[in-house]
């Protein structure tokens, strides 16, 4: 017994940490693994190294290299046709937002720059979401889109406002530090306007209540985000997220807003039998010019947004309603235009795809009639191309497909040019 005990004791004395080489009696604890040992000191050192690693990568790709407003707009031009005023406003706002972050982090001077979130106002399909998505891609920051109509204030059926932060964390591969520098686009923000421009004693859980709930998050606070989403409850753990550096872009169509603006600017008579709409500064609003470009915070208050909420979104960028010409350009010109995407899909099958000018005109006219904007273009083209895309992969005799206006307007089949036809001509 004694001999075995002493042998065991001797064997224990020979145990050493596989990493630092210290003996068992030189450290407080030695943890054994399959053929290896690690002491408590090495474990502590490993924890410190792991804790330091996220800090080295917590800055986004834009640190020290924020694209200038002119550079941002130039890239936006590749993806979004028209909307010059909105692109310039967004380029300046985004540049100033990230410049502010780095200024405040360096604590340069006594002046702390305040956060400026953005309100995008424009018709359905005018490019609001695409602008926000493209900005996030330019800046290489996490991006999340949420629908304001799904949100309700705490205590009611629906999503808590903190869940919008969770989507950003998920899109940042669960890297909270990266998410804290991201962009959140809240769509259909006009749908959470209160039902009248006067305060009500009745509960408006999807309107004014949601605006109140969003205030702190948009302004900047430490939000406690439930890791699994859904409603909060007292016994779950939360992810603390600092929102002061998250850029919030809120977008909406604001149907009826132009009527409010028109009531404010009024119609003034100039000379005999002539009426001209002028803005508050007396400048004539030209025929065809959208009244939405003359929106002021008071108009949004009358629409149903509360003053505190409007104050958190000081930058207002407005988008024009799309015309037939702009829809034609959107279909053909951008870097990843719908035309180029479909041509690429057919090219993979070794088939050329062509749309005649009259076909493109007809597609744009159809989108205008449906009031679906740019996003309606894909649905129209899908209807036209569905049967062809079903057949083409199985056919090896098709050389080229030509879509005409009759294909769009009369639902006739596109013209197909077969390889045999070319051989006969030759």
UniProtKB/Swiss-Prot annotation:
Residues 5-58 form the ClpX-type ZB domain. One of its GO terms (molecular function) is ATP-dependent protein folding chaperone. One of its GO terms (cellular component) is HslUV protease complex. InterPro entries: AAA+_ATPase, ATP-dep_Clp_protease_ClpX, ATPase_AAA_core, Clp_ATPase_C, Clp_protease_ATP-bd_su_ClpX, ClpX_bact, P-loop_NTPase, Znf_CppX_C4. Zn(2+) binds at residues 17, 20, 39, 42. It comes from the Bacteria. Gene3D superfamilies: 1.10.8.60, ClpX chaperone, C4-type zinc finger domain (6.20.220.10), P-loop containing nucleotide triphosphate hydrolases (3.40.50.300). One of its GO terms (biological process) is cell division. ATP binds at residues 123-130. Keywords: ATP-binding, Chaperone, Metal-binding, Nucleotide-binding, Zinc. Component of the ClpX-ClpP complex. Forms a hexameric ring that, in the presence of ATP, binds to fourteen ClpP subunits assembled into a disk-like structure with a central cavity, resembling the structure of eukaryotic proteasomes. Belongs to the ClpX chaperone family. ATP-dependent specificity component of the Clp protease. It directs the protease to specific substrates. Can perform chaperone functions in the absence of ClpP. NCBIfam families: clpX, PRK05342.1. This is ATP-dependent Clp protease ATP-binding subunit ClpX. It comes from Leptospira biflexa serovar Patoc (strain Patoc 1 / ATCC 23582 / Paris). The lineage of its organism: Bacteria, Pseudomonadati, Spirochaetota, Spirochaetia, Leptospirales. The gene is clpX.
């Amino acid at each position: 017994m004694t001999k075995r005990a002493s042998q065991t004791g001797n064997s224990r004395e020979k145990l050493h940490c596989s990493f630092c080489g210290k003996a068992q009696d030189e450290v407080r604890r030695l943890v054994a693994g399959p053929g290896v040992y690690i002491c408590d000191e090495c474990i502590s050192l490993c924890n410190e190294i792991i804790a330091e690693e996220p800090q080295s990568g917590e800055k986004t790709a834009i640190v020290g290299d924020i694209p200038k407003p002119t550079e941002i707009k130039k890239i936006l031009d590749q993806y979004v046709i028209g909307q010059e005023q909105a692109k310039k406003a967004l380029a300046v706002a985004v540049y100033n937002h990230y410049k502010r972050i780095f200024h405040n982090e360096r604590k340069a001077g006594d002046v702390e720059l305040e956060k400026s979130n953005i309100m995008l106002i424009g018709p359905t399909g005018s490019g609001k979401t695409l602008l926000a998505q493209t900005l996030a891609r330019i800046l290489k920051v996490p991006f999340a889109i949420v629908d304001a109509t799904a949100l309700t204030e705490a205590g009611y059926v629906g999503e808590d406002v903190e869940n919008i932060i969770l989507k950003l964390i998920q899109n940042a591969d669960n890297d909270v530090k990266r998410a804290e520098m991201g962009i959140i686009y809240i769509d259909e923000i006009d749908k959470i306007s209160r039902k009248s421009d006067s305060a009500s004693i009745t509960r408006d859980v999807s309107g004014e209540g949601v605006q109140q709930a969003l205030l702190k998050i948009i302004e900047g606070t430490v939000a406690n985000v439930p890791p699994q989403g859904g409603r909060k409850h007292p016994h779950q753990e939360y992810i603390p997220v600092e929102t002061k550096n998250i850029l919030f872009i809120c977008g909406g169509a604001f149907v009826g807003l132009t009527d409010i603006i028109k009531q404010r600017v009024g119609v003034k008579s100039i000379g005999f039998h002539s009426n001209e709409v002028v803005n508050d500064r007396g400048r004539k609003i030209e025929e065809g010019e959208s009244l939405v470009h003359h929106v002021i915070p008071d108009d949004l208050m009358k629409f149903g947004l509360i003053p505190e909420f409007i104050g958190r979104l000081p930058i207002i960028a407005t988008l024009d309603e799309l015309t037939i010409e702009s829809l034609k350009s959107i279909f053909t010109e951008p870097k990843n235009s719908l035309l180029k995407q479909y041509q690429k899909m057919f090219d993979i099958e070794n088939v050329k795809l062509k749309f005649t000018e009259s076909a493109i005109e007809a597609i744009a006219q159809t989108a205008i009639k449906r009031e679906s904007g740019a996003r309606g273009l894909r649905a129209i083209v899908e209807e036209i191309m569905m049967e062809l895309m079903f057949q083409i992969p199985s056919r090896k005799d098709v050389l080229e497909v030509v879509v005409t206006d009759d294909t769009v307007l009369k639902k006739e089949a596109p013209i197909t040019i077969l390889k045999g036809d070319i051989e006969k001509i030759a």
